[in-house]
Swiss-Prot record:
It comes from Saccharomyces cerevisiae (strain ATCC 204508 / S288c) (Baker's yeast). Component of MIOREX complexes, large expressome-like assemblies of ribosomes with factors involved in all the steps of post-transcriptional gene expression. This is MIOREX complex component 1. Keywords: Mitochondrion, Transit peptide. Present with 432 molecules/cell in log phase SD medium. The gene is MRX1. The keyword Transit peptide applies. It is found in: Mitochondrion. The keyword Metal-binding does not apply. Residues 1-46 form a transit peptide. One of its GO terms (cellular component) is mitochondrion.
Amino acid sequence: MGLKITKGQLRTKDLNQSSSKSSQSSRIGVDTCIFTRMLPRINTAINLTEHLLRRSFHSLTNLQKTQVKERLHELERHGFILNKTSKQLERINSKKRRQLKKLQKTAYPKDQAFHILRKFHKINNEALADTKLGPTSQSDLKFLSLTKDKRLFYTILGVNGEQLRDSKLIANDVQKFLKRGQLEKAVFLARLAKKKGVVGMNLIMKYYIEVVQSQQSAVDIFNWRKKWGVPIDQHSITILFNGLSKQENLVSKKYGELVLKTIDSLCDKNELTEIEYNTALAALINCTDETLVFKLLNKKCPGLKKDSITYTLMIRSCTRIADEKRFMVVLNDLMNKIPDYCVDSKLLFEYCEVICSQKSPKIEKQGMGLWALCEYFQFDKTIFKKYLTQSDFPTLVPLSHWNINKPFPLNKHVVGLFMNYCLKNKEYDLAMEIFKTLEAQNNQMLDQSIYHKYMETVITTRPITCGDECLDIYERVASSAQISITRRTLILVYNAFQRQSLKAVINKDASNAEATLHKIRGFIDSVEATYSSKLNGKVYRFNSWKFLFPIVKNLNMNDKVSTVELKSILDEYLKSLLNGEFGKEFKASIEDKRFVTLEGIRLVKVLTERIKLPSLDSEEIASLKGTERKKFLARRHLLRLKQILLEDLADIEGNSRRKGDSENTSTSEERIMEDLAELILETSYDKF
């Protein structure tokens, strides 16, 4: 249905339009005026917006083709649609390469490793039957030389590629291999690590030097590591030189030349440090060719500042000079050249030790080592002058030469060197007086070793009273909280009594012999005897009998020890037997067991001869009464004991003739021995 409009309505509409146009024209005039005024501002805003839009569009412009366009382009050119675009293929290949690279850094599972060994290396199942793969296995070493597959190496060594990038982890694994004695795997792991295996290879060199005691192997590792791509650092050189310097025997000339060659190389590169120079000096001092150390001393190394350790080693190198005159000339010349800042107590101690160790009759006779100790350290010079006369030997360099006003304080190393030198050159009286002076001052520097040297001096110089004096020294040492008692201390006391018991003044006088015997037995009772719950008392240990029997033998060489005293010693010996001190489970050498058993047999023999009776027939034996009867029975018991001890001696020597069940036989013999020992212990020899 259409819309109808009348003429009146049309006229009204036209009028309205004309009026609206007139009003609009008036408004436009006003707006034009306003717009004209605002135009500069609008232009500025439009320009700014346009500028920002331009930068945004420029930064967001996509200059690469999209995957859709690339596929359409290929469709137009070749008539088919690509499954993967080149960019997608590149991304996939890159991902595969990363995964493969990551896989190459992992170890094979053990089943896969065995499969590879069978397939690619043609190893049969029989060879692999008893083979285990892993870091703790020893049966897989042969496969390390068959393959170049790193993943198989990782399986055998128990590592992966990521761990090879960490030098600390490599060093820890190398240390584990070395503790298990797997040197081949340790070396192979360090080789695989290349630059990260420097610390591990240093540990291997140190192991060869200190544990295996193979300097040649350490030198081989030092040379080969360059070819393996494992660099040599400062610690590598120090470990090698230090190991050569600590070898018990002098190292050969070729090792000395290697040291010199290495130092020359470092010196040419201006990389030589004091540590490397000092260790090289120490190594060359221990070389058979003494000329090499002096070549190093005369070598000019630019940039090297010699310290006190360097000069100390230089002094030590003078010990290689055999000629006496040249020794003193070189040594004194060196001492004069030492700068003030390098002189300390350690350097002067080394100087004194070098003089004391020189095996020159003239130097020893002149006592130059003692005078050097007196000059540089705070010894009492009045005591020295009382026992020594200063002979014509080269004058010592005075302390004033280095602007030092007074001698250095004493320490245990200096006193120990002094005591050693006195023992070596038989200056016993000087050593004893100096020791007593220091002990009277309650000097804390007197340690265990110095007391031992003093006891050795007493044993050497005073054979008649050395046992009593060493026992007194032992008691002083035992009362000191700073000094501990060792087995060496006890042995020195025993040695002192053994030496004292050999003197005729002691063993030819009954009272002196028994007094000495009582002292040594009292010492054993208080120090070495242990409580036995089985016997409810103290018993002597096996080690005590090794020393007591010789002392008893010496004291009784003139039959001055009474029968009662010998019976008392036999009683102690039987108590030790009953307590199991000489049993099979006791750990002692065959020689010691044989010696103690023989001495026990000799003691029984002496007692048997002491209570010997005239020959009697059966009727006379039956008629014996009282003391004679007891004496006869006691002698019979001793003879039975002697027979048992002889059988024990045969067992020790491996010549036993006992037959039957060993367990039953030993049990019955123990019962017989216990019964016999109880009978002997109950018998008193006071009236024999």
